[in-house]
Amino acid sequence: MQFFTALAAVGALVAPALALPTQVPANQSLIDVQLSATGNSMIKAVITNKGTRALNLLKFNTIMDENPTAKVMVFDKNGAEVEFTGMLPRYDMNSLSTDYFATLAPQASVEHSFDIAATHNIKESGKYTLSAHGLIPTAEEHGTTITGQAFYESNTLEMEIDASKAAMVPRAFEELDAHIVGTIDKRSGIVTSSCDASQLRIVKQALANSRMLALNAARAASSNPSKVREYFGSSDSSIMQKVASRFQSVARESTASGGQTTYHCTDNRGSCKPGVLAYTLPSTNTVYNCPSYYREPSLTKRCHAQDQATTTLHELTHNPVVVSPFCKDLGYGYRLATGLPTSKAIQNADNYALFANEESSPVFFVPVFYSNG
């Protein structure tokens, strides 16, 4: 990985970034996504490149993600959103490999199938309504440097699901027995039996740094409307209040005495796949760190870069006991996160991590451009 910095032209580089549009119109979509039912709770998604040039699409946190993530929204017959029981990961955007991308030639398609019963709590038989939408980071063909984004919005799929058959589908994350969970420090919520001495020290420091970042961000969200508008698309007083309140909640949770989440230093579920820094199970308010988490810096001074502190902060926003409704992964990185409409931005975990990171960075920061070439 190489870092390219521009010292003399900091102002020239920052200004265009702040001038990016705050919303991505649907008519800019180059991606068509069609959902169809192929079984009781099995879904097939056909993703088509409608453009005239090849698209290199990052699969992380999209309809193409191979991990048990939230690929579709699922609503029951009463219009209530069905509980999601899968994982919400934070991916390492500094070390992208070509394996994480899907390249589609013009008018070409790729299929991806998944069973929603593996990641959703299907309690009753009946009609369910599904849809998918989001932003996909894009790179040049054969490249891994993110250079753009593609919006997608699927058809609305209605399907009948038999709950008894859905119950037979193996869950992506089954409830663990207490002896498998391990020893939990009741003051902090850290599963100490999952940590060696070094990991425990690092996690406690990350929580302390997360608290510091969240408190600084809460103050900024209450007093800096232009900065809230930059990251959340609006400086309305209600938005500023909600953002500040959520940062205060994260600060309360980022403590060594009194956390409501369960925090694992390591993963005992085998879900730390390549590229995952850490992940959360919102259905159980549980956070798991992955090996790559410990290779990140403790607290970076590079604006919009990843580190242990903002990864912990990011994951805490995924927990319903911290933020309700819990934040999802709707857009990754500054460009995609600030391209979301306000209604999505305030529900996107990375907006909070990015906002908190900037508030802790020097005023005259060095922009970072990532290349894995």
From Swiss-Prot:
Q: Which CDD domains match?
A: M35_deuterolysin_like
A single Gene Ontology CC annotation of this entry is: extracellular region
Gene Ontology terms: biological process: proteolysis
Catalysed reactions, semicolon-separated: Preferential cleavage of bonds with hydrophobic residues in P1'. Also 3-Asn-|-Gln-4 and 8-Gly-|-Ser-9 bonds in insulin B chain
Residues annotated as signal peptide? 1-19
Its keywords, alphabetically, are: Cleavage on pair of basic residues, Disulfide bond, Hydrolase, Metal-binding, Metalloprotease, Protease, Secreted, Signal, Virulence, Zinc, Zymogen
Its annotated compartments are: Secreted
Necessary cofactors: Zn(2+)
Catalytic residues (UniProt): 315
- The residues listed in the UniProt record as binding Zn(2+), with positions renumbered to this chain, are 314, 318, 329
> Which residues pair up as cystines?
195-265, 272-290
Does this UniProt record's set of keywords contain Protease?
Answer: yes
SUPFAM superfamilies noted in UniProt: Metalloproteases ('zincins'), catalytic domain
Q: Protein name, please?
A: Probable neutral protease 2 homolog MCYG_05201
User: Lineage of the source organism?
Assistant: Eukaryota, Fungi, Dikarya, Ascomycota, Pezizomycotina
